[in-house]
């Protein structure tokens, strides 16, 4: 059946002499793998359209019994990044695309996830600073959409507020992934839970990202130590909930160059 949908390019792999296997995240079908014939022909109709992160209108011949669908047409809606892009932009882009590819299943449509991905990529593309903050925003929001929301507002052991006003200055928090949130370190120790210690700066940052609109994220500047801590914090939570999650190759590559 011929189907049309909006799609974002997640990954491309050469196939044969002229073709590519392309992974998309689509508005209508979720993650989808397609065969694009003749893509590598410089005079072909797909030339330069299917670049990583591009926003497309896609036409495909979809057959539910096939794992790889045949792509018949792709029209560019908006390109992603350009020759003047910074390393931090490229890092945020590739990590966002890799995360969605590794944490979602084929043919599992989720409009909320698509709209989050689309909005995040747009902001990475046009914003002038703090691009990695958009990736962290994406992670925090994606966690909720995938069904394992983090509780940032109350201690998961005592119910006490973790808001900036309520949290004592000398208080420390730990991540208790098995409880779906954070706990006061003292309360965790009293109950025999070790948890993952989280600095005040890292906790405040991810808590703030869970509450704000994406338009505000560009203003969040993070020190390198806090950036690396948030990487570890959110990575740990994803891996607790998603079995056999592979290592993020884009993070290994870009973080050595940027952070």
Curated annotation (Swiss-Prot):
Record key words, sorted: DNA damage, DNA recombination, DNA repair
Pfam families the UniProt entry points to: RecO_C (PF02565), RecO_N (PF11967)
InterPro entries: ARFGAP/RecO, DNA_rep/recomb_RecO_N, NA-bd_OB-fold, RecO, RecO_C
Listed GO biological process terms: DNA recombination; double-strand break repair
A single GO cellular-component term on record: bacterial nucleoid
HAMAP family: RecO
Role this protein plays: Involved in DNA repair and RecF pathway recombination.
Protein family according to the UniProt entry: Belongs to the RecO family.
Protein name according to UniProt: DNA repair protein RecO
Source lineage: Bacteria, Pseudomonadati, Chlorobiota, Chlorobiia, Chlorobiales
């Amino acid at each position: 059946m011929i189907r049309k949908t909006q799609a974002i390019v997640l990954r491309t792999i050469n196939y044969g002499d002229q073709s590519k296997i392309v992974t998309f995240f689509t508005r209508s079908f979720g993650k989808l793998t397609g065969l694009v014939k003749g893509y590598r022909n410089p005079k072909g109709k797909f030339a330069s359209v299917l670049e990583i992160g591009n926003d497309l209108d896609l036409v495909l011949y979809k057959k539910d019994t096939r794992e790889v669908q045949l792509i018949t047409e792709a029209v560019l809606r908006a390109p992603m990044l350009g020759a003047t892009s910074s390393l931090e932009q490229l890092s945020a882009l590739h990590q966002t695309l890799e995360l969605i590819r590794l944490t979602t299943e084929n043919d599992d449509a989720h409009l909320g996830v698509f709209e989050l991905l689309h909005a995040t990529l747009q902001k990475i593309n046009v914003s002038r600073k703090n691009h990695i903050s958009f990736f962290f925003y994406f992670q925090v929001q994606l966690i909720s959409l995938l069904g394992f929301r983090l509780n940032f507002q109350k201690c998961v052991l005592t119910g006490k507020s973790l808001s900036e006003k309520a949290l004592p200055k000398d208080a420390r928090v730990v991540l208790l992934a098995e409880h779906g949130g954070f706990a006061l370190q003292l309360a965790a120790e009293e109950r025999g839970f070790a948890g993952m210690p989280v600095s005040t700066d890292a906790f405040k940052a991810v808590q703030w990202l869970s509450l704000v609109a994406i338009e505000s994220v560009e203003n969040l500047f993070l020190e390198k130590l806090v950036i690396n801590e948030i990487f570890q914090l959110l990575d740990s939570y994803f891996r607790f909930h998603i079995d056999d999650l592979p290592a993020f190759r884009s993070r290994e590559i870009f973080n050595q160059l940027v952070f």
